[in-house]
């Protein structure tokens, strides 16, 4: 089981996290922007973990986890339209839970201020990698990107997650795809942190995905169930998604 950790020298948060990991685990470092990387730039691995900054208009301190991909024709931030990378729900959720656990310890010890810890929905490149891919990010401004403690939290969480994956030291739970809600997937983040599910792909309300993309979501991830944020999903999308799940033998549930 090979994990490739990827960092960019052009990304302050990426360098911060990598500096706290390199003593314990090899990191693939590049002078390219992370979002410009393709499969040809990376050696083969069973899992790809990108160490990255997160940017937002609100500039709210945050620690986030998500799989990359373009759910619609919009490929403003690179990659191919309507293409997603493979995803592992266990990997994504263990990362989120470990980040939350370690952040909470640092916060209670007075080592770090308030940060939001959450999933993000599927977005941005790269889209063409052939193994499960995930971004772990520090946001949302330079102040947080270079914060030593934030880098330590992500680094520690990545290493703990790799150890758990390699030893299969994790509970068996339903692996789910989530549909609906906003960019930071609050409902699915909460359910994951409550140990209810392992979440992989998360599709927001604002992305009305096609059948082609739906097929990718169930073929590029091991899926046990689809969960629909009932109040956070458009009516016509709910109908289409449910019809697709039932036609493809995917159990679904409203939450």
Swiss-Prot record:
Cofactor: Zn(2+)
Cofactor note as given: Binds 2 Zn(2+) ions per subunit.
Metal-binding is among the record's keywords: yes
GO biological process: D-amino acid catabolic process
Matching SUPFAM superfamilies: AF0625-like (SSF142535)
Pfam families: tRNA_deacylase
InterPro entries per UniProt: Deacylase_DtdA_archaea (IPR018033), DtdA (IPR007508)
Catalytic activity: a D-aminoacyl-tRNA + H2O = a tRNA + a D-alpha-amino acid + H(+); glycyl-tRNA(Ala) + H2O = tRNA(Ala) + glycine + H(+)
Gene3D superfamilies named among the record's database cross-references: AF0625-like (3.40.630.50)
Keywords, in A-Z order: Hydrolase, Metal-binding, Zinc
Enzyme Commission number(s): 3.1.1.96
Keyword hit for Membrane: no
Top EC class of this enzyme: hydrolase
GO molecular function term, any single one: D-aminoacyl-tRNA deacylase activity
HAMAP family: Deacylase_DtdA
Subunit composition and interactions: Monomer.
Family per similarity comment: Belongs to the DtdA deacylase family.
Purpose: D-aminoacyl-tRNA deacylase with broad substrate specificity. By recycling D-aminoacyl-tRNA to D-amino acids and free tRNA molecules, this enzyme counteracts the toxicity associated with the formation of D-aminoacyl-tRNA entities in vivo.
Cited NCBIfam families: PRK03995.1-3
Protein name: D-aminoacyl-tRNA deacylase
Gene name tied to this protein: dtdA
